[in-house]
Design a protein with these regions (language model features):
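Positively charged n-region of N-terminal signal peptides that target proteins for export
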Residues: 1-4, 276
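Extended, low-polarity segments enriched in aliphatic/aromatic residues
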Residues: 27-81, 86-327
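Sec-dependent N-terminal signal peptides
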Residues: 4-13
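C-terminal motif of bacterial Sec signal peptides marking the signal peptidase cleavage site
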Residues: 15-17
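Bacterial lipoprotein signal-peptidase II cleavage site
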Residues: 19-26
Length: 327
């Protein structure tokens, strides 16, 4: 397939458009590639994974959000099925740290069944038997990342995220899916409270420091990235459909005002989240296809700070080379 490559010098401050040359100065590392397709289908999901050129070896975890009861925006079994089958993967999730139908193991398994993931796939609720701690490089707020004990059962992770808004983080993509998503219920509270509590009810005492929460997400995402880099590896995919201002953890999300855009994939989690943000922020609104509500949600929560901090601590690059696999 013929591919067109573009350099995207990613800067939300200037909302710069993609363009330029893929060459860097002598001695500089090449920019990470972010692959893009405008087609959202089971076939294109497999194709964009294959474009990454990485073989999933060993026991493969496919990290998705199973979606809160009542939510219809989560990535559906029929969409992800071909990729999961190709990988021989197991869908992995953890319990939540808020009231709903996924904060207990019993209720979460029922939601998993109701949303069609069982019996279609092997599914592992990674913290149903407890938590374990993995190290983080950035200990400014959190001192470790508390994840489900079953994470140790996997050698390779496909971080398959639904890109959309989020009531607390501003937006959710692969960084959130790696941090809050992989954290156990106690670990979620620990990240939300920027290292102050493991309690689901107590975490709300600490929501006043938004940047500390966002920085804790970046640190936890780096912990998960490092964990799998030391094993067989990790890849990152963002699906840009049903882009409500609300997350899949919301049982009654707002209707999307922005039309579906496509799928992005990369080996660099910072680059792929930044590429999605750039696409949203550079979108030109038309009737029935308006980015304003999603941008307001992101900016009102300072959501881009998660990406900024992730880049600052060395998790990845906000500059990237965009590769359109449709061309």
């Amino acid at each position: 397939m013929k591919k067109m490559t573009l350099i995207c010098l990613a800067s939300l401050a200037t909302l710069s458009a993609c363009g330029g040359s893929s060459k860097k100065g002598a001695g500089e590392e090449p920019l990470p590639k972010v692959y893009f397709t405008s087609e959202i289908s089971p076939e294109s999901l497999v194709r964009i994974y294959e474009a990454l050129g990485v073989e999933a070896k060993g026991r493969v975890a496919v990290k998705i959000s199973t979606g809160e009861a009542g939510n219809t925006h989560y990535l559906k079994p029929e969409f992800i099925g071909d990729l999961v089958d190709k990988l021989g993967g197991t869908i992995v999730e953890c319990n939540t740290a808020y009231m709903g139908k996924r904060n207990t193991t019993e209720d979460h398994w029922q939601t998993i069944r109701d949303h069609g993931f069982v019996p279609r796939f092997k599914v592992d609720l990674m913290d149903e038997e407890g938590s374990m701690d993995i190290p983080v490089q950035d200990t400014t707020h959190i001192k470790f990342d508390r994840v489900g004990t079953h994470l140790a059962n996997y050698d390779f992770m496909v971080n398959l995220a639904h890109f959309k808004g989020h009531a607390m983080g501003g937006f959710g993509g692969v960084l959130k899916n790696a941090s809050i998503g992989v954290a156990s219920s106690a670990g979620k509270a620990y990240i939300h409270s920027w290292g102050n509590t493991f309690g689901m009810m107590e975490l709300w005492d600490y929501v006043y420091n938004q940047d500390a929460f966002l920085e804790s997400m970046a640190a936890a995402a780096q912990g998960v990235h490092d964990y799998f880099k030391a094993k067989n590896g990790i890849v990152y995919i963002n699906v840009m459909n049903n882009m409500s201002v609300d997350c899949d953890c919301d049982g009654h999300p707002a209707a999307p005002e922005l039309l579906d855009m496509g799928i992005m994939a990369s080996l660099d989690p910072v680059a792929v989240d930044q590429a999605c943000l750039d696409m949203v922020f550079n979108h030109q609104a038309t009737e029935g296809d308006d980015e304003a509500a999603l941008i307001e949600r992101i900016t009102s929560r300072h959501g881009t700070h998660t990406v900024d901090h992730a880049a600052a601590i060395g998790l990845g690059s906000k500059e990237y080379e965009l590769v359109n696999i449709d061309l």
